[in-house]
Amino acid sequence: MMTNDGKRTLTRIKNQDNIRNPIVELLYKKIEITNKDAEFLYSVALLLIDEYSKEIEKGIDKNLLIEYAYFIIATTAFKVSDFRALYDFSINYGYYPIARKIIDLDLLSDMNINHVMTNSRIDKFEDGDKILTYQQKKVFEEVLDDKGNAVSFLAPTSYGKSELIFDHLSKNEDKNYIGIVVPTKALIDQVYREAKKKVKDRKLIIHDQNYSKSEDKRILTITTQERALRLVDEGVKFDILYIDEAHEMLNFDYRNNLNNRSLLLTRLIKLSRAANQNLLELYLSPVIGKASNLEIRNSKTISDHRISKDLKILNISFLNSEGNLKYYDRYLGEFIDSEKMIRSHFDYIIEQSKNKNLHFLYRPRYIEGYAKLLYEKLPFIEEYEIDSDIKKLISELAEIVHPKFKLIKYLSKGLVYLHGKMPLIIRNYVLKYVRESRFLSHFVANSVILAGMNLPIDNLFYISGYSNSRDLYNLIGRVNRLSDIFSKENPSLNRIFIPVHFIEMDRFPQNQQGSLAKKIEKLRGRIKDEIKNPLLENSTIATTNSLKAEEIIETEDNIVNSYLTPDFKSRLTRSGAQQLLNYTEQGLQKLSQRFEENQNYIQDDEILIKVKELFFDNFEDFDFSPNYSVDRLKNIATINYYKNFIYNLNTKSLHERINNLVFFWKSKTDSDYQIYVGTQFGEVTRKTENYIGQNLVYVDLSDHINDEDYLYNLAIIKLQVDEDYVSYEITLLLNTLLEFDIINQKQFDRFIYGTDSNEEIKILRLGISRGIYRKLKQDDMIKNIHFDDYGNVKANSLLISYVNEHGVRMI
C-alpha cells in the first residue's frame, strides 16, 4: 500500500478559515460546547473518515486523516460527556480496548441490544486480562506465523513487545541458543525480571562470563551488544536474535570511528549470520519508519509488520521562555495561542502535575540543576506525611552513600533525579521505588535512564534534549502505558490523552542551541528515519565521510570474513583496543611487534604499567589517534590513580570510598588541583601538550574546597565516572592483553573482580556488586545461594528474608 499521510489535505483545512477557526475554537479554547458545536465537529470527523476510506480503496493510506478524526471524536466526547460516537468509531476501526472500557465504565446512556452484541464480539480479542486492538491481534499473528528469517515488529511503546518476544520464543522451543540484545544495562535488569517469570527451561545469562561452553547447552542471553559479541567469541552460535530498540542500529557518529555501538550491533548480526545460516532475527522498535532501513548492506530483506494505529492521543502544550502558553495541533501543524501569560514556569509545572511526572533533560548537569530548582518550588511536606518506605530509603541512602547526598532531601518532597553518572546500583534500587511508590511523584531523568524502561509515567515535562524526532517519539510513548490506561483499577478513560508539556527555559537550552518550537513541529506526520550507520543498505553518507565509511566497511567485512583466522587488526578490533586507539597501518606494525616481544609473565601490580608501555609509550601522532579519555593512560599519574581506585573498588564500601576521596581532595587545598570528570560535569579545560580542545572536562577544586555539600556530591559522580572508565576503556585494553596472551584469565579476573576464586567469580558474574558480595560473604550468606539444573541462581528463604531486611545496606 502506498503511503501518503494526508498532510496536504489537512494543510488545506488549515488554510480555510471558515473551517479551521471553529475547529480551533471548539477543540482548544471553549471548555464547554453545545450539542450543535458537537455536531459540527462530528461532521468534520466524518468528512475526514470518508476521505480516508476513499483513499484506502485506491491503495493509499492517508493515516493522519483517520488519526485526526479519532482526535476530534474523542475530544468532543469528553467535552459533551456523550461517548456514543467514540464507541461507534472504536467498534468500526478496531479500537476495541476503548469500546470495552466505555462499556465497563457504563458511559453509554442508552445501552441497547446492538451494544450488547458488539461488546460480546470483542471477547475474541481478549488476551489474558487485556483486550487487543484489531490491528494488534492481526500483526501479532502475522509475526508469529512469518516463516522468514528476518522479521520486524514495529509498534508504539506498550503495544506488547515483551509479550511477543516470549510468545515467539515459545513457538521456537526447539532452538537452544537464544539472545535478546538490549541497549542498556538498566534494560537488562528489566527484561531479566520478566524472563525469570516466563522462562523455566533455560539458563538465563546477563553477562558473557556467566556462560560455560562445556555446561550450558540451552540458554537465553539478555545482554548488550558488547556482551553478546563476547559470547560469540566464546563460541555461542545463536539460533534466534531479538534486537530490542532496533532503531539504535541507525545511529552513527563519524567522530567516534569504530567506537560506535551501532557498529558493534551490526557486527553481532553479521557474525551470527555467518555462524548460523538458519539464524532467525526479530527486530523490535516503536520508532522505525521502514523496516528496510534496518537492512545490512548486501544481505537479507526484513519483513515489515507494523501497528500504525495508536489509541493514545497527544495533548501538546508549549510554554516558551517569555511565558506565552500555546497548544500544538500536530495534524494542522499549527501553534494555537492560549491567550494566557504564565508568570512562573515552575508554578505552571506544579499546577499541571499529576501522579507520576517525568521531567526530561538530556544533560546530567541540567538534571541536577533543574531538580534543585524544582525542589525549592515544591511545597513542604511534614515528616508524618512521608511514606514509611521512603523514610526507610532516605535512611538507607544516608548510611550507604552519604548524609550529604542531595537526592536524600529531595526524596522528602517526592522528587527523584537520576542520570548515568550516579552509581549504577543506587540507580537500579531507586528505580524500584519510582515504579512502586505513589509518594514519589516527580522524576527527573534523561534517556540513559529511560531507554526501553517501563515506568508508570502519566505526565511529561520536556525541558531540553537532542534534535532527533525519533527519540522524542520514543520518549512520549513512555507516558500512560496501555496496561495502565485500560487496567481495571483505572476508573476513567481520560488517560488516552497524553499530556506533553514542552517548557522552554533559557538556563536549560536544547542541544547545540536548537529550537524547541521546531522540535515540536517534527511531531507532525510519520517518523523519518535518519540512517547514518555506513553498514546499512540505505545509509546516507556525506562526501566528507566517504573515505572513513569505506575504511569502516572494509574493516568490518574483514572481521566477518576472516573470523576463524583473523589477522592482527581484526583481533585488535574485536578485542576492543582499536576502537579506542585507532592505530594507523604503521602503528599496527609497531604494536604487533611489541606484542610479539612481550610474552614474558608480568606481575598483577604491573598490568596497568604494561598497558601504558604497550599501547602508548613512544608512539607518534602519525601512529595512532586515541580518544582523549583513553589517552590519559599515557600519564603515570593516571596509572597510579587507577591502580589505587581499583584496589579500593574491590575492598571498600561506597560510603568509605566517598569519604576517602573527599578527605584526599581536602588535602590538596594548597595546590592547583584539577580532577577529570568528563564533559557532563566539567567546568574548566586543561590544556596540555596532548590536549588543546575546548571541552570542559575538569573541575578546579580550589573553586569549591569550602563547599562540603558540593564536594561530597561531586565525589559520588567522580566515583561512577571512574568505575565506568574501568568497566569500558581499561577493561577493553585488558581484554586485548588477554586476547594476545600477555596476561592470563586468572590475572584478568583478579584485576576486574579482586579474586580468581571460581566460586566467587560465578556469583559476581550474576551482576551482584562487589559491595553486596562482600556483605553476603561477611554474614555467611553465600551458602544460601544455589543453582538449578540449568545454572540459574536461586535463593533459599533465609537469603530472601536477609535481603528484604537489609535492602540497599548491603552495598
Q: What does each model-identified segment do?
A:
Residues 1-811:
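N-terminal helicase ATP-binding lobe
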